[in-house]
Amino acid sequence: MSEKKGEVPYLGIIINYDKDKKLDKFSIDTLRDRYLWQEESSPQEAFARAAVYASTFQEETDYAMAQRIYNYASDLWFMFSTPILSNGGTTRGLPISCFLNYVGDSIDELTDHFKENARLASSGGGIGGYWGDVRSDGTSTSNG
């Protein structure tokens, strides 16, 4: 837990370090290990970062919305998805948990699918694909 106490301004909203007490030791350890940035000393700071990120569109932040989202997360009424909590408001990884892309029925489309998935996975995105247009098992792939 952070040594900071009470309500303080952070990233344009008010956070409450005392709300760390709502989390058990395992939760705090997991959040520190997997989700907090090095500069963040408390899960409350990560919740605020994600809330401000989720409330920003075209470089305009709705701080009242960010405050509400932070309040809901810090009261444990809901929790951010992993990519939002770990990557939202940062320059690392992608803030999206799952990409579903199309797989076509040609060598070029198949290899493009694998290249695209490699790029997405290396940026932290979950991946999947629609394979419905690929010919079935046992179907000839030659022209002769």
Annotated model-derived regions:
Residues 1-144:
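Extended catalytic cores of very large enzyme megasubunits
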